[in-house]
Amino acid sequence: LHAAADPTGWWNLYRFRADSGGDAAGGRDGDAALPTAGDAEALRETSAAFGVPMWTLGVSTFAFLGDGRIATLVTEGGDPSLRLLDPETGDLVDPGLPYSSFRPASIRSDGDRVAFVGHRTDAPSAVVAWRPEADDGGPRRLRESTDDALDPAYVSEPESVTFPTGDAVGADDATAYGHYYPPHNPDAEAPADAAPPLLVRVHGGPTSRSEASLSSTVQFWTTRGVGVLAVNYRGSTGYGRAFREALKGEWGVRDVLDCVNAARYAADEGFADPDRLAISGGSAGGFAVLAALAFHDTFDAGASYYGVADLRALAAETHKFESRYLDGLVGPLPEAADVYEARSPVAHAEGVTAPLLLLQGGEDEVVPPAQAEAMIDALVANETPYAYVEFPEERHGFRDADNVARAHAAELAFYGAAFDFDPAGSVADLELLVGERPE
C-alpha cells in the first residue's frame, strides 16, 4: 500500500507493508493485518508536498508506471509539478512539463501513459496524455477546457510573491505567499505616475490554495486595469503541516491578517494604489472579506461570494460533511461560544464602513442564504453602503456561465460605484443601498 503521510511535517510518499496473518492491526484470523505507521517506509523524505486535501472523490496525486516508477504531484515552495519518483532509489526527476497547476488532482496511468488535467499560465486548462519514455513531441493536449480563441497578447502572467505577516497588522514574524497578476491590456495605457488599484483574492477551503494558472476571472480584472493578488494565507496547503496548521483555532484571525498585510505590502512596494484596495473571495474567502472589513480598515471595498457572516449559525446549519469542521478551525461548542461571537462579522458589523457587495446562491446548503440575510440586516441597521445580488437557483459556487458573467459584471459595477469611476463595456445595473433592504 502506498499513501501520502506527513510524520515529518510534509506529505511525502510512504510504502506500507502488511504483515501476513494475525489480528494485531485489525485483520481477521487468516487475513493480512492492516498496515500501521510502524510499517511505513519513506520513498523519499523532502520538504515538499506529495499530497493534497481529500475534499472530493477521485483524488489521486500519484500513479504507477509499468516500470515501477511513480508519476507524482510534488508541491515545492507552493508551486506544483508532475515528477517521476523511483521508489527503490528515491530519485526524483522533474521532466520540466509546462504545467503550473493540476486540478482536479487526479493522476491516472495505464502503465505506459500518464493522464491528468494540466493548467498553464498562458493557455486554457486541458486533459493531457503523456508518455514519459516516448520521443513524440511531449505531452498531448487531448481536450481543452474551452473552444474560444485566446489572444496571448491580453494575458497577464503571475509573479510569485512572498511577504511578511504575523499576528498583528504590520507584523513581520511570519511569512505568507501569493501570486500577483499585474494589469495588462495592449489597447490601454495607464497613467505613468499612478499605481493601479488592487484586488486581493481570497481562496476558499480554508485549507485550499491559490495556484498560478490562467483564470478567466483574474484576466477579467487585469485587462481592465486592476492588479490581482491571490493570497495563500496561513492555513493554505502546499507549504507543509506547520503552515497549514497555523490556522487551527485561528480561523478568522490569521487568514484575515495575512490578506490585510498582503495589501499593505503591495501598497508599500508601489504596485498598488493604497487608496484603491479591494478584497474579494468566496465561501471561506467570503468570510475573510467580511472579517477584513469588520475588524480592519485597510480595504476600501469588498465583495463576498456566499461568505460566512455568523460562525455559530454556520456550525448549526451547514451540511453534514463539514458539520464538525469548525471544532478545529475555531473551537468546540459550547466551550468556545465566546470565540464564535468575537469572530463573527455580523456581530461586529458596525466596523464595516467600506462599501460591501454580497453575492449569494439561493440553494446554497453549505453557507445558507440566511447568512447573507443576517449580514444585510446588520448593514441596514448601521447604514453601511452595500449591494446584494442573489442567484436563486445557484448552490455553493456558481456554475451557470450566464450567472458567472452576471456576477463579474455586478462586481465591476460595484467597484465603479465604490471608487467613483465609469467601467468600460457592459456592466450590471447595480445601486448601492444605504439604510434600506433590497426590493
Question: Regions from the language model: what does each represent?
Answer:
Residues 1-2, 70-71, 114:
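Hydrophobic beta-strand positions that form the internal "hydrophobic ladder"
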Residues 4-15, 45-56, 73-83, 118-126, ...:
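A flexible loop/linker signature enriched in serine peptidases of the S9 family
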Residues 6, 17-22, 26-59, 75, ...:
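Multi-bladed beta-propeller domains
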Residues 57, 64-67, 108-111:
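Residue-level detector of Asp-centered blade-edge/turn motifs that repeat once per structural unit
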Residues 61, 104-106, 126:
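Conserved beta-strand position repeated once per blade in WD40 beta-propeller domains
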Residues 145-276, 282, 309, 316-324:
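Cap/lid segment of the alpha/beta-hydrolase catalytic domain
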Residues 236-439:
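Active-site-proximal cap/loop segments of hydrolase catalytic domains
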